[in-house]
Amino acid sequence: MSRVCQVTGKRPAVGNNVSHAKNRTRRRFLPNLQTHRFWVESENRFVKLRLTTKGMRIIDKKGIDSVLTDIRAKGEKV
């Protein structure tokens, strides 16, 4: 499973670890992904999504039905 948020599309970023001596080594910044089940009243079932905590806040704000239509418009099967 890829480390991509289904709501925001956020994916791992690449940067550097910087030591006290300013030595730089490459590293990945991973998104804060969570797997969460949401109850969808209109479909009378649970939907499991892999999303970041920011994606959860977006669902709190817009509602699960609105977010699911956006995800399905992108072509993802949910």
From Swiss-Prot:
Keyword set, alphabetical order: Ribonucleoprotein, Ribosomal protein
Record flagged with keyword Magnesium: no
GO cellular component: cytosolic large ribosomal subunit
Pfam families, alphabetized: Ribosomal_L28
GO process terms (BP): translation
GO MF: structural constituent of ribosome
PANTHER family: 39S RIBOSOMAL PROTEIN L28, MITOCHONDRIAL, LARGE RIBOSOMAL SUBUNIT PROTEIN BL28M
Family affiliation: Belongs to the bacterial ribosomal protein bL28 family.
Protein name: Large ribosomal subunit protein bL28
Species in which this protein is naturally found: Psychromonas ingrahamii (strain DSM 17664 / CCUG 51855 / 37)
Name of the gene this protein is made from: rpmB
